[in-house]
Design a protein with these regions (language model features):
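Cytochrome P450 proximal C-terminal region
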Residues: 1-7, 16, 47-48, 138, ...
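N-terminal membrane-proximal hinge/A-helix region immediately C-terminal to the signal-anchor transmembrane segment
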Residues: 2-100, 104, 113, 128, ...
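Cytochrome P450 catalytic-core helices
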Residues: 270-295, 391-409
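Conserved cytochrome P450 K-helix E-x-x-R motif and the immediately C-terminal K′/meander segment
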Residues: 32-51, 226, 298-332, 353
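Conserved cytochrome P450 K-helix/beta-meander segment immediately N-terminal to the heme-binding cysteine loop
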Residues: 344-371
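Cytochrome P450 fold signature focused on the C-terminal beta-domain
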Residues: 235-239, 291-301, 314-334, 349, ...
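Cytochrome P450 heme-thiolate monooxygenase catalytic core
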Residues: 2-18, 86-94, 106, 110, ...
Length: 441
């Protein structure tokens, strides 16, 4: 059998081209710009024109990407062997920031081993132990919101989720250490995508702004390594994620550092944005706001969680997730060559009327009905062996934030026009910052 081109190939032979789904003939650079800046309109137009499975090409090197929008096809990918569908390779651009031991960068046995070590800190009893800590931080945050004056709630959520990372994940409670870390970590989580080019072109790391970023990263690493060393000698009575990891596994300092930075970058902006969208919708919908307030008063966690889930459905923070084929494979009825990137289009699935009646409506009750959404139709955390390890933590965090805010305030939208989404790195955030106004209940 003739060899097939790899991911970085500029051209495909005619036989390979015939195995690919149909797709746009726009120049690769044009497709890349549309994907990066307008994916919420680019993907729906592509599906409308070419069907549920289509091909796009992205820089660098005109790489081939096959996009899936049917749940059965996406389940097929998520359920495939991780050795055939690699996810870590596609994240190598993140290595200068997250580190080579990051769970997001690992594949095969390395990924299985690291995930097994991390899982106990993100499930069951551990999550229940974090909930009270998150709730107290949320109560302290909402108590400082301005009354009767419009403000951008997305930034408040960013501040709060950073505090959760600092105190609940890192376990930092010393006031001086918190004051030292906050401004540094805020710069880390606000990193420009340009910095990630250092993963492709290491020579860039010797010049600004990459050199400036490395200096910042060294400052953060120095504090994190010091915190890890202190914690190794004092785990008694600790209930944070770092302490649980130290107590349960045999970790090197570098492995721990890489996981902490990964949790910071993967869990900060995503949860903050999801909650910004949730409050944006509640402020514009009095009936759903009243539903949430009743749930907060009654301690109805399932109903509060349903609000978080519906916000993640209607406004997926990450619009797509990818895999890279390590060998030729049959996917969605096509024989795809080794090196092909496969994208599961979360945003297309979440707004498909076949799976979510009236998909444009914000209706949390759909997650509480006797016939809830079918498996593979609600996938904000991905799926299969690569499903986000922090999914349970994120839902718990969102539930506690809603509980604190909805028990305290009424919400209004100063501008009733729905906010569009705008790309920010890999996420889609409210363009006007999720502007709301609150009054005491």
């Amino acid at each position: 059998m003739a060899s097939t081109p790899l991911l970085g190939s500029r051209t495909l032979d005619r036989q390979t081209a015939r195995t690919l789904p149909p797709g746009s003939r726009l120049p690769t650079l044009a497709q890349t710009v549309l994907f990066a800046s307008h994916r919420k309109t680019f993907f729906p137009r592509m599906r409308e024109r070419y069907g549920d499975v289509f091909t796009i090409r992205l820089v660098p090197s005109s790489r081939v990407v096959v996009v899936l929008s049917r749940p059965e096809h996406i389940r097929e990918v998520f359920g495939s062997s991780p050795s055939v569908m690699h996810a870590g390779e596609g994240n190598t651009v993140l290595e200068p920031i997250m580190g080579s031991h990051s769970l997001l960068l690992l594949d095969d046995e390395d990924h299985v081993r690291m995930r097994r070590q991390l899982m106990p800190a993100f499930s069951g009893q551990a999550l229940r132990g974090y909930a009270e800590m998150v709730h107290e931080l949320a109560r302290a945050e909402v108590a400082n919101w301005p009354i009767g004056k419009p403000f951008k709630l997305h930034q408040r959520m960013r501040d709060l989720t950073l505090e959760v990372i600092l105190q609940v994940v890192f376990g930092v409670t010393d006031r001086d250490r918190l004051n030292q870390l906050r401004p540094l970590l805020d710069k880390i989580v606000s990193v420009s995508p340009v910095i990630m080019l250092g993963g492709f072109y290491p020579s860039l790391l010797r010049v600004p702004p990459w050199r400036t970023y490395l200096t910042l990263q060294r400052q953060v690493d120095e504090i994190l390594y010091d915190e890890i060393a202190r914690r190794r000698g004092n785990l008694a009575g600790r209930n944070d994620v770092l302490s649980r990891l130290l107590a349960a596994g045999n970790w090197s300092d570098v492995e721990l550092r890489d996981q902490l930075v990964t949790l910071l970058l993967a869990g900060h902006e995503t949860t903050a944005t999801a909650m910004g969208w949730a409050f944006h919708e509640l402020a514009r919908r009095p009936e759903e706001l009243a539903f949430g307030q009743r749930a907060a008063d009654a301690g109805a966690d399932d109903e509060l969680e349903a609000i978080v889930k519906e916000a993640m459905r209607l406004h997926p923070v990450v619009y797509q997730v990818g895999r890279r084929l390590t060998e030729t494979a049959d996917v969605a009825g096509y024989r795809l060559p080794r090196g092909t990137t496969i994208m599961a289009a979360i945003g297309l699935v979440h707004r498909d009327a076949e799976h979510f009646p009236t998909p444009q409506d914000f209706r949390p009750q759909r997650f509480l009905e006797d016939d809830p959404p079918a498996p593979g139709t609600w996938i904000p955390f991905g799926g299969g062996a690569r499903r986000c390890i922090g999914a349970g933590f994120s839902l718990m965090e969102g539930t506690e934030i809603l509980r604190a805010a909805l028990a305290t305030y009424n919400f209004q939208a100063p501008n009733p026009t729905p906010e569009p989404a705008k790309p920010k790195n890999v996420t889609l955030v409210p363009a006007r910052g999720a502007e709301v106004a609150v009054t005491h209940r």
